[in-house]
């Protein structure tokens, strides 16, 4: 290590490096080797929960544990400490006369943050705390930096997000939140697997952005000398698999959108998309409700979910309402009536709804009304269906009213949690929708997509009637962990 670097270290870091060197001089590897535990902290607590001090003493049972040293007290020939593993903490009781002088020195010189292995007798203290009375201490890894001063609950938000590892060490609530996230994803997989869906993987690098209305990240493939984009959705590749006969597929994976960041948006996020042949959007509503209720039950149990003080009746059937009916109920404006674009624009002006340059159809105005007046009222789980064709380029038209599509979005607490529809499987109609999107892009709509001719070709080989779904995993995790920002459910959120 250079002298220059040593000068950058603070006193605590220098002392820890000196201890590292001392361990090496004793023939101890400061960064350890494989260590076999017989139990973790929670397993011991569960196993001995009903035994008091005397009963434990009579059983004379031993255990071998390992973890990070997070508290340490005592002096002279006796010490107490807590080791933290992934399940929690357990106390160790170390006596010099029980472990020997040389072994006691390892404990005595250990710093908070170091990893230790402990063999010993399972006991309970006079205060009733389950502990391990050490018979041998093994040094497993040296921490060269001290834990933050606010170790018992890291509070600096910037540090929490930039150095998630420190947050996980110091904040048990945060640690458990990410365990819950993992369980939510596992349970969604389990639910779909049991219904015969096949999990697949599709490309992250695309030649053309498609499957969603979003601005992509652009990159360049040097060997092929072509520009490519990071996927903004998995939709079009998954539907190619439906064409190929897979019938029931899903993918859980990262999506990338070059857009703004706020409490519910991060440039990269996790979604699940699901496609089922021979189904329509009504079937997919049932599937969506089942997925979310199963995930909620697995981590929250039966009953409603409390989110930021509001009781969400996630365990009850979700409300279903047509977009036009929802708008009429809130504003009194009836978009069921036939009207020209100019008439719709006049109504928008009267209601002070902004009209963008690329609003070329009445459907654009209808969608703007929904976003302006209805979204903020949707607290309980609600399926809003019947989106206009103009804002649904991949959805099948409703056979009874071709101004609208067989599409729905799921809203909870005013936020969109899912988007689904009866898939458009008519290649001629799909091409005309793509062309309309390309025109909107020319008029300044950054979120409009281009034309994916390869996808059109795939549809020309025939795709069965199909229902498809996309759910934002991160927002669902926010709901089920009662958190208000997406950064709290992403281990490593995007930072400046």
Swiss-Prot record:
Free-text remark on how the cofactor is bound: Binds 3 Mg(2+) ions per subunit.
Recorded name of the encoding gene: lysS
Binding-site positions, Mg(2+) 1: 409, 416
Source species, domain of life: Bacteria
Database matches in SUPFAM superfamilies: Class II aaRS and biotin synthetases (SSF55681), Nucleic acid-binding proteins (SSF50249)
Record keywords, A-Z: Aminoacyl-tRNA synthetase, ATP-binding, Cytoplasm, Ligase, Magnesium, Metal-binding, Nucleotide-binding, Protein biosynthesis
Species of provenance: Streptococcus pneumoniae (strain ATCC BAA-255 / R6)
Residues annotated to bind Mg(2+) 2: 416
Major localisation: cytoplasm
Listed name of the protein: Lysine--tRNA ligase
Gene3D superfamilies linked to this entry: Bira Bifunctional Protein, Domain 2, Nucleic acid-binding proteins
